[in-house]
């Protein structure tokens, strides 16, 4: 069906009026991305990492728990995120929690969402991945002012300095990690490249390696028709690299619906959305010991 000029005009007017009807609609970002692209965010993140070093999280024992959530989409209702933080903080075997992206829903809510997280120097250390909603409305600089980096890694160790597990966070907020970040990951996992081959490059030094980010590899669920995953070529490159690098698990969000896939020697888990008005909402609790076990907890 061919549209008339009048119909095109009406659709154009409605398209331009959408931001006034829905503040979550980022027209400027849709037409021309306002936050820096992944290559620039990667560059800024690595510069920050170089200034602070690699974090080490002290865990209470060789068997410890990690609480994992994603897609809280905070705007005004913080019930589920608050309950998640409280549950993790109350668990004496949980030294760290992960948020897999889309901390906020739209513009202006990052400071409020940050106020819901454990404060710095809390016994519960929180690490975040960057989601697509977190960079809408040119929010990257604000997000970076709180969290510093969207691409980083850290490791856990016992009080006697015995190194245990490695966690690697990737920036996939645009549905790609880009060539520079891919090379960084390759060097980190395989030691093939220019990075110093100290603790960071030898996966045999670690009991487990977990990669976490926002974007998923696989999606059989179609409840979120608009969500996208990586291009097929990037999926092939990344999954092959994770297999070569001895990665145990890949944790992500974005699709809002749980999906668990064993592929190429690792387990990929899409964690359910945490947001309040998206029932049923869940978070994941992973227990790391000689094996990695996990279960999901549903909010009432």
Locate the predicted segments by residue:
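Alpha-helical scaffolding within the catalytic cores
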Residues: 43-55, 79-86, 110-115, 138-154, ...
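N-terminal active-site segment of His-dependent metallophosphoesterases
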Residues: 21-111
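Short, basic, low-complexity termini and linkers enriched in Ser/Thr/Gly/Pro
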Residues: 1-20, 115-123, 161, 190-206
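Structured helix-beta-strand junction loops
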Residues: 122-124, 150, 197, 244-245, ...
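Binuclear metal-dependent phosphoesterase catalytic core
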Residues: 24-47, 258-300
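His/acidic metal-ligating clusters that form di-metal
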Residues: 86-96, 162, 166, 175-268, ...
């Amino acid at each position: 069906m061919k549209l008339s000029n009048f119909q095109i005009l009406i659709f154009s007017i409605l398209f331009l009026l959408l931001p006034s009807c829905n503040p979550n609609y980022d027209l400027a970002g849709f037409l021309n991305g306002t936050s820096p692209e992944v290559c620039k965010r990667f560059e800024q993140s690595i510069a920050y990492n170089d200034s602070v070093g690699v974090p080490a999280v002290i865990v209470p024992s060789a068997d410890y728990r990690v609480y994992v959530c994603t897609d809280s989409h905070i705007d005004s209702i913080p019930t589920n995120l608050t309950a998640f933080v409280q549950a993790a903080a109350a668990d004496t075997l949980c030294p760290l929690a992960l948020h897999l992206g889309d901390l906020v829903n739209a513009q202006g809510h990052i400071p409020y969402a940050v106020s819901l997280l454990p404060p710095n120097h809390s016994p519960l250390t929180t690490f975040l991945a960057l989601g697509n909603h977190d960079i809408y409305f040119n929010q990257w600089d604000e997000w970076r002012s709180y969290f510093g980096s969207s691409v980083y890694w850290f490791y856990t160790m016992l009080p006697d300095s015995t190194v245990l597990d490695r966690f690697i966070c990737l920036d996939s907020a645009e549905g790609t990690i880009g060539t520079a970040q891919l090379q960084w990951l390759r060097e980190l996992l395989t030691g093939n490249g220019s990075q110093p081959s100290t603790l960071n490059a030898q996966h045999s030094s670690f009991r487990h390696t977990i990669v976490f980010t926002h974007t998923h590899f696989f999606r059989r669920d179609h409840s979120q028709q608009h969500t996208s995953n990586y291009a097929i070529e990037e999926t092939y490159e990344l999954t092959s690299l994770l297999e070569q690098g001895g990665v145990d698990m890949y944790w992500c969000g974005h699709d809002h619906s749980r999906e668990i896939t064993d592929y190429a020697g690792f387990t990929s888990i899409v964690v359910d959305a945490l947001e309040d008005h998206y029932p049923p909402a869940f978070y994941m609790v992973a227990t790391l010991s000689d094996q990695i076990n996990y279960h999901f907890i549903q909010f009432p």
